[in-house]
């Protein structure tokens, strides 16, 4: 789906169409969710609407038993896994939260249903030598503007831990004059500051010299060859092309740089609260998952270095 907004089909009920629009606006404007997240929530809602039409249920009169029936239907027809169930339930809870706020329903029927918590996967990150290999790689066209941009983009991703949607929406006027600090708008429209190291600043400075001459009026920092802002899909494509040129089997994704950023900070002794702030996590528990990665590295060092551990 990439950056392309999901389009709801036109339903027979006009109130249904208006309700869907209110929900999408809430996700987009108030929650500041990425387009990919909005697409996923939209598809979840589409499934639910279709189920309600099929069963002749009124969206505004739904009971908890109807929500249970819906998930039983999904499990039987689509065989969705636990992770998908949890997200679809989250979508419905958010949807009815909006309806409740608009006084369109009396209660939220989705709050009375729960699934066992999905175990969070340990994030995958690059090893230090892998990160260096990606950053130091130079293609045959290293002097081209697009290559200079790509190098700056990768340095920024690793130096700051930005989410990909934060990267593509980053504005030039939110960047400090010395290029070391950037103000970003993250999830839930939460503002935070991220910081760039020497390598990122140097690469960014080189890229901006070209970018500002070619497209001085553009708002976003990272642009395509037509002067339009890069899309999240475009960033993923660029990284995948770099992977191919390097001859790598491993994937290179924006989120992997974010994971590596967090893990490397914790490995170096950074306070977890500071890492939480830099990543823009609202909950410390989200950041704590990186500790398990860091602990595994410590165990590995111990096993290799301690005389008795090697026996």
Swiss-Prot record:
UniProt GO cellular component terms: cytoplasm
Location comes to: Cytoplasm
Give the superkingdom in one word: Bacteria
Q: What GO biological process terms are annotated to this protein in UniProt?
A: cell division; chromosome segregation; DNA recombination; DNA transposition
- Core-binding (CB) domain spans which residues? 14-100
Question: How does this protein assemble?
Answer: Forms a cyclic heterotetrameric complex composed of two molecules of XerC and two molecules of XerD.
Q: What does this protein do?
A: Site-specific tyrosine recombinase, which acts by catalyzing the cutting and rejoining of the recombining DNA molecules. The XerC-XerD complex is essential to convert dimers of the bacterial chromosome into monomers to permit their segregation at cell division. It also contributes to the segregational stability of plasmids.
Family, per entry: Belongs to the 'phage' integrase family. XerC subfamily.
Q: What is this protein called?
A: Tyrosine recombinase XerC
What organism is the protein native to?
Leptospira interrogans serogroup Icterohaemorrhagiae serovar Lai (strain 56601)
